[in-house]
Design a protein with these regions (language model features):
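Extracellular/periplasmic catalytic domains that process cell-envelope and extracellular macromolecules
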Residues: 19, 42-45, 68, 89-93, ...
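Sequence contexts marking disulfide-bonded cysteines in secreted/extracellular proteins
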Residues: 16, 30-33, 98
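Conserved beta strand-loop-helix elements of the APE1-like EEP
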Residues: 97-104
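Conserved H-D interstitial segment of serine endopeptidase catalytic domains
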Residues: 3-6, 25-28, 32-85
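Short helix-loop capping/hinge motifs at secondary-structure junctions, enriched
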Residues: 9, 58, 105-108
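A conserved glycine-rich beta-strand in the N-terminal activation segment of trypsin-fold
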Residues: 6-22, 91
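Hydrophobic, repeat-rich solenoid/adaptor surfaces of innate immune receptors and signaling proteins
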Residues: 19-20, 26, 100
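Active-site substrate-binding loop(s) of clan PA
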Residues: 35-39, 79-88, 104-141
Length: 141
């Protein structure tokens, strides 16, 4: 799953994410913040962005072999705080965002909704809880 900026000469991958409903993607707030800032500057809507799914290979995304769905809305966590570089604080706080899509992906063998693990009481996870993540970003800080 990736979010892409449309430019005829440039296939710019903005960020990766996970399909949490047929029409919703869970991703990082720092990715969504960039999209929101650029849309405010240029056209005040998300028509230049779309979400693609269906292959783990970035080259396949670039060659348009996967479905492409426009973005309808972006919801950044209300307590998101980006890293503060000049204070050497490289960790973002509440770096989470949900992207709502214009319509749903068709669920196939290659496109699936992730199964989010919740504890019984829907409480916050304990510090140092073992988790699995996916994406094409940094693998260490």
């Amino acid at each position: 799953m990736l979010v892409q900026y449309h430019d005829p000469d440039l296939h710019d991958v903005t960020c990766s994410g996970s399909l949490i409903k047929e029409n919703a993607v869970l991703t990082a707030a720092h990715c969504c913040e960039v999209i929101q800032n650029l849309t405010k500057i240029y056209n005040d809507n998300y028509t230049d962005y779309s979400v693609l799914a269906g292959t783990p290979d970035l080259k396949s995304f670039i060659h348009k072999v996967s479905p492409e769905i426009p973005i309808k809305a972006i919801y950044i966590h209300e307590n998101y705080r980006p890293p503060i570089e000049n204070e050497n604080d490289l960790a973002a706080i509440n770096d989470i965002c949900i992207i709502k899509l214009e319509h749903s992906f068709n669920i196939t063998n290659d496109i699936q909704v992730v199964q989010l693990q919740m504890n019984k009481n829907r409480e916050n996870l304990e510090i140092e809880t073992h988790c699995h993540v996916s994406g094409w970003g940094l693998d260490e800080v």
